[in-house]
Amino acid sequence: MSIIVGIRCFGPSKATARLEGSKTYSKDFMKRHNIPTAEYGNFYDYESARQYLDSVSHQVVIKADGLAGGKGVIIPATKEEAHQALREMMVDHQFGAAGNEVVIEECLEGDELSVLTFSDGYTIRSLPPAQDHKRIFDGDQGSNTGGMGCYAPTPIGTKEVLEEIDRTIVQPSIDGMRRDGKLSLHSSLVTLN
């Protein structure tokens, strides 16, 4: 807890915030701590990323590593669109330095759910689950935006789903952050159809 200008507040340290601010770092964190995540590759150079993209047969999501105003995640419909998105991020620097590194991951189908969790390093407490509306058009169509809104609680966040999230994602994340000396968590999850 910090007191700045007389306002009591709390939040993640800069080191902990890296889990939200760097997609490559958070994917490696999940892998290191055996937390379920989509199949992925992290890339620092365009040619390696391009070759990886050519080698996969599944639909992908391409993510700029850094913060890009909520617009750095591209879900291409075709391999050509994927190559275009990769080129725009890494060669044309569409998102500036945020796209110097990218994650190319398997596209998972399902409903997305956000869970904001607080912890002292052992106990976990979560706010009601929320569902974001990131796309620019109705019906979850169009490109992602910086945020079109959300609502909570969401009906997809059933008691059973939340218990599974706590058991397989939240608690292992807290345990991993404690082992790494970092604590705070915001989870954006996809429940598979």
Regions inferred by a protein language model and the residue ranges of each:
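Short, glycine-/small-residue-rich phosphate/pyrophosphate-handling segment
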Residues: 21-52
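A short, GP-enriched loop/loop-strand-helix hinge that lies immediately N-terminal to
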Residues: 1-21, 35-42
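Conserved anion/nucleotide-ligand pocket segment
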Residues: 57-79
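Structural detector of well-ordered beta-strand residues that form the stable sheet scaffold
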Residues: 10-11, 38, 61, 103-105
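Internal nucleotide-binding/catalytic subdomain
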Residues: 72-193
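Catalytic-core regions of core metabolic enzymes
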Residues: 2-5, 15-16, 48-49, 81, ...
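Short, charged, surface-exposed secondary-structure boundary motifs
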Residues: 18-24, 137-138
